From Swiss-Prot:
GO terms for cellular component: membrane; plasma membrane. It comes from Homo sapiens. It is found in: Membrane. Glycans are attached at residues 170, 179. Gustducin-coupled receptor implicated in the perception of bitter compounds in the oral cavity and the gastrointestinal tract. Signals through PLCB2 and the calcium-regulated cation channel TRPM5. InterPro entries: TAS2R. It is a multi-pass membrane protein. Residues 1-14, 80-100, 163-190, 269-276 are extracellular. Several bitter taste receptors are expressed in a single taste receptor cell. The keyword 4Fe-4S does not apply. GO terms for biological process: detection of chemical stimulus involved in sensory perception of bitter taste. This is Taste receptor type 2 member 40. Residues 36-58, 122-140, 212-247, 298-323 are cytoplasmic. GO terms for molecular function: bitter taste receptor activity; G protein-coupled receptor activity.
Amino acid sequence: MATVNTDATDKDISKFKVTFTLVVSGIECITGILGSGFITAIYGAEWARGKTLPTGDRIMLMLSFSRLLLQIWMMLENIFSLLFRIVYNQNSVYILFKVITVFLNHSNLWFAAWLKVFYCLRIANFNHPLFFLMKRKIIVLMPWLLRLSVLVSLSFSFPLSRDVFNVYVNSSIPIPSSNSTEKKYFSETNMVNLVFFYNMGIFVPLIMFILAATLLILSLKRHTLHMGSNATGSRDPSMKAHIGAIKATSYFLILYIFNAIALFLSTSNIFDTYSSWNILCKIIMAAYPAGHSVQLILGNPGLRRAWKRFQHQVPLYLKGQTL
């Protein structure tokens, strides 16, 4: 059985690393919570009023709500792992954090992949029978695909609660050349089971996202070149919109892949718990959902208008409270 063993002491992490990790990841998580919470509130209010949400808005509602839960959970995990290490390294607590983190991340990766597939089918233009078939069927199938994604995420996340992680704390490790002792945190990770369940849960949405993003970029680039050949000019608003969409899609394709890699490295304990590499993984994992939520607001005219109204109303509300 292939296992990865790590150990750490309280001396292995400096106050600077603790502060840096909490501040940077905290800013990212709070940004993501505000962005995801705003999108959830806008679409959730429409759904609560009995309105039928369009397919794209429905995907964004589920994606934003799951991200809201994810980033709250990530903040809690960072606080416990850095400030309450004895509690965090109890086996049941540690496994709970890991399993729910993987489940929420898998769900987010699925929802993000379906959103990219939906936009690709709606915007891109390819003369292929399969593409036309998917374009016609996607609206009917999407509610079932979203439900199936949650079930798949559950199926490949909760088995991680058995025979994958084992952590414990030894509070009586003798310090050489001293009569005192120190706490040492040990972790064991069954890499065979982790790699199997993690890859099974992430492989399909990762391939879907890469294919959909690549097809969307190719279609937009082809259309942009066509517009350029017709001498519409690089300053044309439509041309700028296409170039902006290509850049945004390329950026989040790269960040999506990095997020998937960072999640695996962080979960597998390949790096020491308090190493700079593990801290970098935590920062990347918090950056992707936060950045994508902000981009969704800025790139959606309806959400952008709602955000401007919100910004205008908050000062008025606060002013009324002080009177």
